[in-house]
C-alpha cells in the first residue's frame, strides 16, 4: 500500500485522508484557571495544589482574569470572532487524576469561533478554526509497578483548546499548521509551545474516504501527540490502518487511539465517547462570562506584529527571500536581534552573518539566540569593522569565533590579536613587486591570456601578509603591475 502525501493507493481504490486537530495549549499565567495555586513547572509532586484543585468540600472556583485575557488575545491573533457571552460547563467523567469527577470547560458557548490559519509551504490554503474555549487541565497519573501515584500540580492549570475544522488532507499540512500555531502563540506570549514538556498537546481526528467522495468516514481520535514528528507518523499510520480495514470488508469503529512511539503504530485505547456520554451542563458555581467591547478592543490594540505580517514586511520592505524572511520572523527573539542589526547594516551583509555564522555557532552549542554570547550590538560592531575596511570578511569570521568563545568585543579582539587589515598601498606595493619578480613564468603565462593566474598572485600576497592584506587593494595592485611592460 502506497501513501503519497494525503492520497493512499489501496488495492481497490485511492483513498483521501480527512484530518482535524484539537490542540491543548497551556496558558501562560502565574496561577491556575480557578485557583491561586502556582503553575510553575518541575516542582515536587503535589506542592502546587489549592484545596479547590482537589475538590475539597466547600471550595468554589474563582475565575482568573489573566487567563481570560490570554484566551481573547489568542482568539484575535487567529482571526476568530470573540464572543461577549460565554459559559463554563461541567464535563462529567471519572478518572483518578480528576478529583472532582468533572472538568470545567466551555461546551455550549465557547469564548471564540470562526478563525483561521493560512498555510503557505506544503500547500496554499486557509485552515478553519472552529472554536477556542477555556478549560481545566487534569492531574497526572504515574504508574510504578502495581501502584499508581497521583500528582495534582497540573490539575486546574488553564488550557486553551483550539479546534480546527477537518480541513487537512495530509500529515504534512497538519504538521505545518502546528508549526505556525506554535509560532503565533509564542509571538503573542500566550503559550510557550513546548511540546516536550506538555505545554502544547495535540489530538488528531483521522478518517479516510474514497477520492471524490464528499461524505466523511468514521473517525479515530489519536490522543496526546507531543511532537510534530509523532503527529505526522501517527496520522499516516492510522489512515493506512483504516484503509486496510475497509478494503478487507471491515468497518472502522469510532474509537480513541494511542500512538506507540517505539513501533510507530496506533492502537485502540477505548471506543470514542459521544457528547451525550459526558452529560454536559452549565457549572452552577460560575456565572456566565460577559466581556465588553472595550475589553476586547484594548487587547486587540496590544497585539504585537504577528509573524505572518512580519514575514510579509521583511519580504516587501527589506527585500528578503521567502526562506530568509520565514526564518527571521518565526521567533520574536530572532526578529528583535535581526532588526537591531539591519538598522545599522544592509540586509545582504547582516542576514548571512545571522543565519550562517551566528545560527551555526548557537546550534553547535545547543543554545537559543536569547542566550547568545554575541549580542546584536556586538555583531553590529564587528560588521562596522568589516564595512570600514579595518578587517576583511575572512578575518571577521575568525574574530566572531573568538567573540563567541570569550564574550569579548570585536575591537578588543582585533587589537589584542593584531588583526587589523593592511590597507596601505605603500606597505603592499613592495610585496607585490617582489612576488611578481620572483614568478617570471607565471607572469608570462598571465600576459599570454591565462588570466586565472591572478588568483595565484593574490594567494601569494595573502600568505605573505598572514591574510591581513586588503584583498581588493591587492587585486588592484597586481593587475596594475602585470599590465606594465
Swiss-Prot record:
| Provenance organism | Anaplasma marginale (strain Florida)
Q: Which residues form the signal peptide?
A: none
Keyword GTP-binding in record:
no
Provide the top EC class: ligase
Gene Ontology biological-process annotations: glutaminyl-tRNAGln biosynthesis via transamidation; translation
Quaternary state and partners of this protein?
Heterotrimer of A, B and C subunits.
This chain's protein is named: Aspartyl/glutamyl-tRNA(Asn/Gln) amidotransferase subunit B
Mind listing the UniProt keywords for this protein, alphabetically? Answer: ATP-binding, Ligase, Nucleotide-binding, Protein biosynthesis
Q: Which family does it belong to?
A: Belongs to the GatB/GatE family. GatB subfamily.
**Pfam families per UniProt:** GatB_N, GatB_Yqey
A GO molecular-function descriptor: glutaminyl-tRNA synthase (glutamine-hydrolyzing) activity
Sorted alphabetically, which InterPro entries does this protein's record hold? Asn/Gln-tRNA_amidoTrfase_suB/E (IPR017959), Asn/Gln-tRNA_Trfase_suB/E_cat (IPR006075), Asn/Gln_amidotransferase (IPR018027), Asn/Gln_tRNA_amidoTrase-B-like (IPR003789), GatB (IPR004413), GatB_C_1 (IPR042114), GatB_Yqey_C_2 (IPR023168), Gln-tRNA_amidoTrfase_suB_CS (IPR017958)
Provide the reaction this enzyme catalyses.
L-glutamyl-tRNA(Gln) + L-glutamine + ATP + H2O = L-glutaminyl-tRNA(Gln) + L-glutamate + ADP + phosphate + H(+); L-aspartyl-tRNA(Asn) + L-glutamine + ATP + H2O = L-asparaginyl-tRNA(Asn) + L-glutamate + ADP + phosphate + 2 H(+)
Q: State which Enzyme Commission number(s) the record gives.
A: 6.3.5.-
Q: Which NCBIfam families match?
A: gatB, PRK05477.1-2, PRK05477.1-4, PRK05477.1-5
Q: What does this protein do?
A: Allows the formation of correctly charged Asn-tRNA(Asn) or Gln-tRNA(Gln) through the transamidation of misacylated Asp-tRNA(Asn) or Glu-tRNA(Gln) in organisms which lack either or both of asparaginyl-tRNA or glutaminyl-tRNA synthetases. The reaction takes place in the presence of glutamine and ATP through an activated phospho-Asp-tRNA(Asn) or phospho-Glu-tRNA(Gln).
Nucleotide-binding in keyword set: yes
Amino acid at each position: 500500500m502506497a501513501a503519497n502525501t494525503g492520497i493512499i493507493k489501496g488495492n481497490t481504490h485511492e483513498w483521501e485522508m480527512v484530518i482535524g486537530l484539537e490542540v491543548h495549549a497551556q496558558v501562560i499565567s502565574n496561577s491556575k484557571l480557578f485557583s491561586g495555586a502556582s503553575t510553575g513547572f518541575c516542582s515536587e509532586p503535589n506542592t502546587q495544589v489549592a484545596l479547590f484543585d482537589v475538590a475539597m468540600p466547600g471550595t468554589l472556583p474563582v475565575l482568573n482574569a489573566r487567563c481570560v485575557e490570554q484566551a481573547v488575545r489568542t482568539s484575535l491573533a487567529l482571526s476568530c470572532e470573540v464572543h461577549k457571552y460565554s459559559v463554563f460547563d461541567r464535563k462529567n467523567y471519572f478518572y483518578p487524576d480528576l478529583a472532582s469527577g468533572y472538568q470545567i470547560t466551555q461546551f455550549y458557548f465557547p469564548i471564540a469561533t470562526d478563525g483561521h490559519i493560512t498555510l503557505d509551504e506544503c500547500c496554499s490554503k486557509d485552515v478553519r478554526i472552529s472554536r477556542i474555549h477555556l478549560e481545566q487541565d487534569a492531574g497526572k497519573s504515574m504508574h510504578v509497578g502495581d501502584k499508581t501515584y497521583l500528582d495534582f500540580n497540573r490539575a486546574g492549570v488553564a488550557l486553551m483548546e483550539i479546534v480546527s475544522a477537518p480541513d487537512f488532507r495530509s500529515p504534512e499540512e497538519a504538521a505545518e499548521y502546528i508549526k505556525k500555531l506554535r509560532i503565533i502563540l509564542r509571538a503573542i506570549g500566550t503559550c510557550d509551545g513546548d511540546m516536550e514538556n506538555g505545554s502544547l498537546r495535540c489530538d488528531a481526528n483521522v478518517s479516510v474516504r474514497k477520492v471524490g467522495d464528499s461524505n466523511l468516514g468514521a473517525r479515530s481520535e489519536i490522543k496526546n501527540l507531543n511532537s510534530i514528528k509523532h503527529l505526522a507518523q501517527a496520522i499516516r499510520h492510522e489512515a493506512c490502518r483504516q484503509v486496510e480495514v475497509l478494503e478487507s470488508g471491515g468497518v472502522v469503529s469510532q474509537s480513541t487511539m494511542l500512538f506507540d512511539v517505539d513501533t510507530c503504530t496506533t492502537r485502540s485505547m477505548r471506543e470514542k465517547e459521544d457528547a451525550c456520554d459526558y452529560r454536559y451542563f452549565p457549572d452552577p458555581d460560575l456565572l456566565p462570562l460577559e466581556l465588553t467591547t472595550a475589553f476586547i478592543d484594548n487587547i486587540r490594540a496590544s497585539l504585537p506584529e504577528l509573524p505572518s505580517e512580519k514575514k510579509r514586511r521583511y519580504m516587501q520592505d527589506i527585500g528578503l527571500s521567502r526562506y530568509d524572511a520565514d526564518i527571521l520572523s518565526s521567533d520574536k527573539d530572532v526578529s528583535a536581534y535581526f532588526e537591531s542589526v539591519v538598522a545599522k547594516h544592509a540586509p545582504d551583509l547582516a542576514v548571512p552573518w545571522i543565519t550562517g555564522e551566528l545560527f551555526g555557532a548557537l546550534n553547535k552549542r545547543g543554545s537559543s539566540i536569547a542566550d547568545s554570547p554575541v549580542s546584536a550590538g556586538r555583531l553590529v560592531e564587528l560588521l562596522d569593522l568589516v564595512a570600514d575596511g579595518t578587517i576583511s570578511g575572512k578575518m571577521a569570521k575568525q574574530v566572531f569565533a573568538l567573540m563567541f568563545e570569550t564574550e569579548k568585543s570585536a575591537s578588543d579582539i582585533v587589537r589584542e590579536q593584531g588583526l587589523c587589515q593592511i590597507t596601505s598601498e605603500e606597505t603592499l606595493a613592495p610585496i607585490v613587486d617582489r612576488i611578481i619578480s620572483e614568478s617570471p613564468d607565471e607572469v608570462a603565462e598571465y600576459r599570454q591570456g591565462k588570466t586565472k593566474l591572478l588568483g595565484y598572485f593574490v594567494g601569494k600576497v595573502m600568505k605573505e601578509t598572514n591574510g591581513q592584506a586588503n584583498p581588493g587593494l591587492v587585486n588592484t595592485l597586481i593587475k596594475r603591475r602585470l599590465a606594465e611592460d
